[in-house]
Amino acid sequence: MSQTLSFVLKTHNVRKDFVRSVKLTLARRRDLQYFYNKLSRSMRAEACPSCASYDVCPNCTSSDIPDDGSSTELIPSWEEVTKTSTYSLLLSEDTSDELCPDDLANVAAHIRKAISTQSHPANSDMCKEQLTSLLVMAEAMLPQRSRASIPLHQQHQAARLEWREKFFSKPLDFLLERIGVSKDILQITAIWKIILEKACYCKSYGEQWFTTAKQKLREMRSYESNTLKPLIGAFIDGLRFMTVDNPYPMGFLPKLIGLIKPLNLAMIIDNHENTLSGWVITLTAIMELYNITECTIDLMTSLITAFYDKIGKATKFYSHVKALFTGFRTEDVSNSFWYMAAAILCYLVTGLIPNNGRFLKIKCLLVRATTLVSGIIATQKLAAMFATWNSESIVNELSARTVAISELNNPTTTSDTESVERLLELAKILHEEIKVHTLNPIMQSYNLILRNLMSTLDGVITCCNKRKAIARKRQVPVCYILTGPPGCGKTTAAQALAKKLSDQEPSVINLDVDHHDTYTGNEVCIIDEFDSSDKVDYANFVIGMVNSAPMVLNCDMLENKGKLFTSKYIIMTSNSETPVKPSSKRAGAFYRRVTYHDVATLVESHKRARPGTAVPRSCYKKNFSHLSLAKRGAECWCKEYVLDPKGLQHQSTKAPPPTFLNIDSLAQTMKQDFALKNMAFEAEVGCSEHRYGFVCQQSEVETVRRLLNAIRMRLNATFTVCVGLEASNSVGCTAHVLTPDEPFNGKRFVVSRCNEASLSALEGNCVQTALGVCMSNKDLTHLCHFIKGKIVNDSVRLDELPANQHVVTVNSVFDLAWALRRHSTLTGQFQAIRAAYDVLHVPDKVPAMLRHWMDETSFSDEHVVTQFITPGGVVILESCGGARIWALGNNVIRAGGVTAIPTGGCVRLMGLSAQTMPWSEILSELFSLLGKIWSSVKVSTLILTALSMYASRFRPKTEAKGKTKSKIGPYRGRGVALTDDEYDEWKEHNAARKLDLSVEDFLMLRHRAALGADDTDAVKFRSWWNSRSRLADDFEDVTVIGKGGVKHEKIRTNTLRAVDRGYDVSFAEESGPGAKFHKNAIGSVTDVCGEHKGYCVHMGHGVYASVAHVVKGDSFFLGERIFDLKTNGEFCCFRSTKILPSAAPFFSGRPTRDPWGSPVATDWKPKPYSTTSGKIVGCFATTSTETHPGDCGLPYIDDNGRVTGLHTGSGGPKTPSAKLVVPYVHIDMKTKSVTAQKYDVTKPDISYKGLVCKQLDEIRIIPKGTRLHVSPAHLEDFEECSHQPASLGSGDPRCPKSLTAIVVDSLKPYCVVVNGPPHDILHRVQKMLIDHLSGFVPMNISSDTSMLSAFHKLNHDTSCGPYLGGRKKDHMVNGEPDKALLDLLSSKWKLATQGIALPHEYTIGLKDELRPIEKVQEGKRRMIWGCDVGVATVCAAAFKGVSDAITANHQYGPIQVGINMDSPSVEALFQRIKSARKVFAVDYSKWDSTQSPRVSAASIDILRYFSDRTPIVDSATNTLKSPPIAVFNGVAVKVSSGLPSGMPLTSVINSLNHCLYVGCAILQSLEARNVPVTWNLFSTFDMMTYGDDGVYMFPTMYASISDQIFANLSAYGLKPTRVDKSVGSIEPIDPNSVVFLKRTITRTPQGIRGLLDRSSILRQFYYIKGENTDNWKEPPKTIDPMSRGQQLWNACLYASQHGIDFYNKVYKLAEKAVEYEGLHLEPPSYSTALEHYNSQFNGVEARTDQIDTSGMAALHCDVFEV
């Protein structure tokens, strides 16, 4: 609508009243918007639900609040509002009153006024951020159903929805960044909602969303400075102790000087240099000065280790670090050491990176501190600033997160069970985080707000639990029914039974009531008289209760909606023996779920004996012994009968006798039934790393058990010793003593020595020697001291305490923090400071504080035991994976000293015992030994390194000359001198190829290229050097006149610029003007004065296409008036005698690109639009290119480069992306046909055997018969051969299928549309392949300008095509074409020189060849596409040079067309294959018919890229891109896809297609796994292609996704298979035996050879080529002895490479052929054949034509091919 409006507003011919009405409407809307904004600034006082629906609400008519906050008639004053309980709750005062809607409305009204008016008294109490956050806090504290009463709730919700729509598609990094910088609480809440929503649906959006959400919920933006208070407090205490409280004040100054060592420190700082070596020297000197070198090295080691553990998960790490450092302001300081110290101090105090903004705020406060009073005031303001950054931001952040989570608790948002589970987990994490803040003393003033937030999250957690329970299977309860006469005591017995089943009070359900809000969900449920009402469907109710499916109860109260039935035991009573009739449809389901107990009592006998008298109390017993409980059998519908399984005769099966029980046994039976009903098979636990098995003989079990117990006592270990597989609960690992036959799912160790004397070895602390096991120190430490989880012990037993390794007396917080670092990992050390602070200052809460700290801390795998002696008591901490802690208020003296870590001795890796140890453990021991060696020399190594750096300061440095003297030197290395020319070469090479080579690398590469090295880099360098040499004349002599006088210089006319490959930019992201498509076919249309009006496009033969409003009036083209103008709507055509050098093809279809290559989005539906030139029927489209007046007439093209529409209008500056395109329509401009064409578009379509085609005037039949005959030597045994001549048609008994049917079946796949890869993926890969080939193929290869020269480059043994019968050599006289052929060539060449596309037509035939017998029986033959000789000549002239350049570099590039497989080239292939990590050999089924036209067009564009872009090239390009037309049997079929086998340059185009397909599949697979591809794929892997044959050499990354790569190839329409055509997935193959081009590339005793398939060699002896015949089983009448002898000779040479055994078999066949065929040939011996082949392979003797042919099995080509 907006684009249409823009066209309407530009139209001059529309009615004035319509324009006036539009203007008035827009003005009215602006006035209403201004009035609405004014009203929104004067906020209303009421919480009116209708306000959102009106611009001016009719209900809100109260006056505004005065500026001073005084009261009005309806609204109390600000002073009165602050006294209400609602305001107190918002300010977190101690009140439990609920939020009153009226009070909230009043508070909101004053807050609105305070925001807009500075004089309002609320501004003196709170800042504006606090005012705006109050309502958000209130929203977070209320349940979601109660938020409608909060003022501005609907506006807040709408704002959050708008922010959600804006940010929902943004990446995670962007959202996290916005949270960190945004100050808008509504925006932050919306972003949190997006993150949490995608985290709940991480299955669709990625697991990183859920992981990041869990991590970020535990983090806060603000820095809590109270963690530094213990540090500052300890510093103050230490300073007080050294000064005021020092008993020897005179000794303080010398001690302080001796501690600081100021002279040495000053000398170190004065010698500091701001370089890498300078920092190393300075820091090393300071560490050595204060004797902290060793501990600093250990700390740096742990930091680097943790950094490299986390860097793999970091995203955009480089950009973040770069942004951090580039954001700092450069300061003019003489020594950067003090600047660094100030920055670190600011970070430690404020917790904020000292960027420019924070420094400015602090600086503004400190600048005013000129006196003592102003200094105190400034300090107070700084403290207030820091407090505001901490507390307020924490509460606001928690409120935003709570609102986001509560709004996600909605079935429409989180719909499936997985999302509910993740939402539940996120809510629990946030609940725990808020709970932690409630324990913080600094946050006590906000405690009530935090508890209300926790209450809101409790509601979310409860709701999520309900929703999970509804969707999950539950335990099936047990239902017992007590039946008997009234008054027998059933209800009392049910109550007594309920008490024995559970300590809880039973839940009671009354089925006579519709709603069950009173149901409590306890374990036992009693339903008394469940069948008393006939109106209740009690049978289905019972079936629903006793079921594994969740049962939702019908409740009336809102908070009980979704309540589930959860009881385990159901006890029901009934007076009816059979409540459900056996004939009921639900009887089977009912009686299967319940168990009946018939209740009888002594009261009945008393009533019968004494009717009319009251029953005495003596008839009732407290233990219910007066009751008789008879348990019926299963499915007994009465006492006598059981339900019939068939449901027919229910009184046919007698019931078993009942079982009599009492109340106690009945309760026990119910518990057993419940356990039996809910019994399930559990999967066996996999191999556990906390279970250790010691395997010994049965007689040694007891001894090993005693040894292990002795080890446990000796080392005070935490593991538990068990005999057998059963394990008991343990705080650590479990050691199992096993026999060899017992299975075990843990780590196994074989005990090789076991006796009582080994106990003495324990005194030497060598556990492995005592047991005789090969066990690493890591495993031993893990076994003995691993702790599961985190345990806090409030009570202490001295015999359970571990021996201390460290005893720390805590005098300051530094002592505690430094000791805790031994226990924690790097991330856990930051929590140690807060725990130390809590232990020191709040000793009464030691267990709670340490429990929380331990839950949040990750402990190292090393065993560490530390005893802390603190003022509040003693704390003992033991950690190893987990942790145990003992905390006491009193001091405890712990004896036992310091223990040593158990070791395995120095001989445990010697002997055969090490064979059972994995390599990882052996290497771990090696690294441990190297670590010990390093620990002994690390300090001295660092000091010596720093000393050598210090000494190198005074060493003279070599400096290069010329341009490398100063700042423009090489990137790496020193002392390399370059001349000016060499420097220019180095810079140009790096810029042209986008490399970062150092000077040394560049000189080495240039040297290797000059010496003729054949590696890829050297070849590409030579190609670049040649291109640069051609540009040597790009200089111009100029005269420069300046202050220095007159100088003569040479300046470069071409600017050096790196080529932007754009591998990481998709086609859809490209924009901006560039080179126009079909620029050689586009001309300018001018008026009589020569001014430009628009463009036209040459269609050929002097016919041009344009748009009507451009050629309207007097129009000229190239200075000549246009004529013969014809229009069809806005599209028009005209003629001109001025003919452009090229022509563009036109087609009716949807465009994909605009004239400059940008993508086009359009529905391509012509509609009338109003423009400045009147009504125009066209199609609306959008592109990213901005057009200008005068661009009308430019072409819009499709994927094949065909023009489908012309530009005719745009939306102007307001909507520049809107375009109006006139689609192409056919206009008959023909005068007389100048060339023959079989396919006539004017003829009607006909259906021919299922094909849509055009009927021709002449009929060319498909040739019949075959020239293949059985050899006279094999008339009897020719059936032993695996191949036979192809099917001959309907008369062939092997397959009666006609030749026409075979051709039709072969053409049908070509008529199916194949889409191929996505367009943007294909475009990117095409650019990569062009860049890769640019290193081998030169640019601007000249096309052939001579028609006869191009014709002689063709193979004259092939067909002339559909316009001339026979082969080319049939029309040759003395080596030159005859008149018929010359006339045809001349007519086509004339059109090609004008850039006009030629008819793309082929004549169809069937290949006469040997085929496998099974394919002969199926009637499968390969088609021959006979290309028009004129088209072939034009294509040879255009692209033969480019094709030869590509094939000449087959040794380096991916295309192997032109390779000789019987030459040393095969050795180069083998070396390429051997260097790959994974090798895949792939073949494709139906390759030709599955080719996408878009891929073929991209390959043809690659050929055109390297050509000289002449009209001949344009004609060939447009011809080959047009759909091929198959001509046969008097019809012409236009195919939709596929690549004709007879297309010119088919091998090269097929190979380029192959490369593009594989590159697209790899690119799409990588980016599907979130790997952005910014590099050239073809530079990272190698491949060899020849048509459909391919060998892919993948690195590990690509091989890991090979399944996805081949799946993508299949999705493109291809059919990849194994080389041997076997069924199964394509897997890596052995690189020592790779099949390529029907050759097996492998190593033989003679070297690397390409072995021809044995069956191909053997069938040479069975068949001979002769005259055409229908009886191929008869020998030919004549045999050419020369050709046949050469064929058999070559077969013997190929057979010699397979070994002597196979050669002997071939030799016998050769002797038999010579005898029966009368050949003058003596078959060579094995040694002779081997010698001849090796000589020809190495180029010693001339190769025969057969061997010299490249490609497939070449030795029979002259004999068997057509």
UniProtKB/Swiss-Prot annotation:
The modification Phosphoserine is found at residue 1066. Residues 1072-1228 form the Peptidase C24 domain. GO terms for cellular component: host cell endoplasmic reticulum membrane; membrane. ATP binds at residues 484-491. The modification Phosphothreonine is found at residue 1039. Keywords: ATP-binding, Covalent protein-RNA linkage, Eukaryotic host gene expression shutoff by virus, Eukaryotic host translation shutoff by virus, Host endoplasmic reticulum, Host gene expression shutoff by virus, Host membrane, Host-virus interaction, Hydrolase, Membrane, Nucleotide-binding, Nucleotidyltransferase, Phosphoprotein, Protease, RNA-directed RNA polymerase, Thiol protease, Transferase, Viral RNA replication. Pfam families: Peptidase_C24, RdRP_1, RNA_helicase, VPg. The record marks 46-47, 331-332, 684-685, 959-960, 1070-1071 as: Cleavage. Signal peptide: none annotated. GO terms for molecular function: ATP binding; ATP hydrolysis activity; cysteine-type endopeptidase activity; RNA binding; RNA helicase activity; RNA-directed RNA polymerase activity. The modification O-(5'-phospho-RNA)-tyrosine is found at residue 983. Its EC number is 3.6.1.15, 2.7.7.48, 3.4.22.66. The active site is at 1109 (for 3clpro activity), 1130 (for 3clpro activity), 1192 (for 3clpro activity). GO terms for biological process: DNA-templated transcription; proteolysis; symbiont-mediated suppression of host gene expression; viral RNA genome replication. The keyword Membrane applies. Residues 458-614 form the SF3 helicase domain. Residues 1477-1602 form the RdRp catalytic domain. This is Genome polyprotein. It comes from Feline calicivirus (strain CFI/68 FIV) (FCV). The lineage of its organism: Viruses, Riboviria, Orthornavirae, Pisuviricota, Pisoniviricetes.
